[in-house]
Amino acid sequence: MINVYDDFTKLNEVILGDINLHLLETVNVKYRQQVEDIFLQTRDDLVAIQTVLESKGVKVHRPKISKAFAKTITTPAWTEQGVRNCLSPRDSFAVVGDVLLEGASHKRSSHFESLYYKELFVELFQQGGKWISMPPPALSDLSYDNESYLTNIEPILDTAQLARFGNRLLVSTRGAGNQLGVEWINRTFDKFEVIAMDGCFSGHLDAQIKIIRPGLVISPYAREKHPDFMQKWDIIPTKIYGDALAIIDDRFQDDDWDNTYFQTSMLSYDENTVFVFDHYKKLFPTFIKDMERKGVECVFIPFKHQHWFSQGSTCLTCDINRSGGMEVYD
């Protein structure tokens, strides 16, 4: 049953992404062997993550992969070499309350990404779930701007720009959405209090802040930058990861191109348990100790190439069912 009103109550059902190896044919021959190695290792890591999730009683769904997704995509506005890989469903899909939402991604390669999950979405709909999509954006050149990245001529919003907190819905537009996208969310989910968080958050919201439970948040930002309801919360401080992206062009030569890379995209099992990548034990021991002091258990999972993919454990998943409801948190 579709039910997600927060990002921290007990996780019962989830989508876990995968790697479509057929997309290797769209990769520059110069890098193809290295990318294949990364793809294969990542696929193995995802199998291990699925095993950990299932050991905790979580029902896990996986995308349906097809060679057809490597075909060239052509619309009246653009041409793209293949559908985006199915590694990070959280970027394009989210359950908001009792509604399965397909977002309006700013990436042209995501135009047909839902085909990976179509059978599952139909199944969830047949079980009684609600299912809606944002208007598919044209994503012509007019949708992009050098200064703000995205213009405001059509609604655009990655679903990774949403964070759920009971009757509140937090949303950011920086880099992966625009104001029309936020307004579409505001009108469509009018039973929620929609809170815009554009004061400082850049990139996907789930990679910037993480609500562990009411009263505790992981964040790199000063207290005054947070919404009013968070002003008295405990904050576990982190670094802003943005500087690492400046050397992204080197990632094919060095898979450790940003070893200090940290993002708060961490999947919660419940209010006291989060899934954290293995290498954080070595790279961020202070953070792990801070979590333990707050009574939060870190369950370590493998994901060797987080740096290369720029993904966290939340990015790799899409919650389908959590135990929480539309609570009103003080």
Segment roles from a protein language model:
Residues 1-330:
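The feature marks the mature, well-folded catalytic cores of soluble enzymes
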